């Protein structure tokens, strides 16, 4: 009996290894079948650089004192299918996880805002003149739907809409070294040392926009891309009153892709 058990234990690793090899072969076969039907699978990662900005810049924002991009990254998988005999045109569908963030410091005048006074005296609301610090850090699941065009075997351009769901997000900051007028620019003036705001819970969950870019196939299994994504709806709902102008996420992405 002991010999039988010992034999089974010795055979178990071989069975697991064989099963693993079969799974790898099945995965390879599935990828090959997809490629034969015109679909080419890719995995990629990259870095986002940009910001969340009103367009055009409103008169209330007098000067951008500083801008600090966040450590923003993206990971994605996509499938690409080319059409026609010459394989010039194609369709690319993907799913990516991405972060978009920044920090800014600005000088503003008559900037409508609502914040909590750091001295404990309560909420201040009205037209703010002074300094404003803002921190934005949002994470999204994004589906791009892109048309592609190949100039040759190495160069490709792509463009189309994208649709995003915000997994979690932060929009917070502080107003300092200034004063606020009650409700409007001609209201009662109150000096404020520092006040904080946090509108993270008011961020819009669903966003959409356009993406356009180019890609260079450096090696058989490696390509490098540069893309621009431009949000077409603001990060806050249209009825949000604490920020009176729309803020759009505008980011450039440097990406690297492994082509199966």
List each language-model region with its residue ranges.
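Hydrophobic, lipid-facing positions within transmembrane beta-strands of outer-membrane proteins
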Residues: 39-41, 71-77, 139-145, 208-212, ...
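Extracellular/periplasm-exposed beta-strand and loop segments of Gram-negative cell-envelope proteins
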Residues: 51-70, 100-139, 166-207, 211, ...
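Bacterial Sec-dependent N-terminal signal peptides
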Residues: 1-24, 39, 44, 147-149, ...
């Amino acid at each position: 009996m002991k010999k039988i058990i010992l034999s089974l234990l010795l055979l178990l690793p071989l069975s697991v290894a064989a099963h693993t090899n079969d799974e790898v072969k099945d995965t390879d076969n599935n990828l090959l079948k997809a490629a034969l039907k015109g679909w080419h699978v890719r995995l990629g990662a990259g870095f986002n650089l940009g910001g969340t900005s009103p367009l055009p810049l409103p008169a209330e924002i007098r000067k951008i004192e500083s801008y600090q991009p966040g450590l923003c990254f993206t990971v994605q998988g996509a499938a690409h299918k080319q059409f026609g005999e010459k394989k010039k045109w194609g369709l690319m569908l993907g799913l990516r996880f991405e972060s978009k963030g920044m920090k800014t410091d600005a000088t503003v005048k008559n900037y409508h805002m609502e914040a909590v006074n750091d001295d404990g005296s309560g909420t201040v609301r009205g037209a703010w003149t002074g300094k404003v610090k803002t921190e934005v850090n949002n994470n999204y699941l994004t589906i791009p739907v892109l048309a592609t065009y190949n100039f040759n075997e190495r160069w490709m351009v792509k463009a189309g809409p994208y649709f995003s769901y915000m997994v979690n997000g932060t929009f917070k900051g502080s107003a300092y070294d200034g004063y606020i007028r009650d409700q409007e620019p001609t209201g009662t003036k109150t000096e404020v040392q520092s006040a904080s705001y946090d509108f993270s819970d008011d961020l819009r969950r669903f966003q959409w926009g356009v993406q356009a870019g180019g890609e260079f196939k450096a090696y058989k299994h490696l390509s490098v891309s540069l893309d621009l994504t431009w949000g077409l709806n603001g990060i806050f709902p249209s009825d949000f009153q604490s920020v009176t102008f729309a803020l759009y996420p505008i980011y450039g992405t440097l990406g690297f892709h492994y082509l199966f």
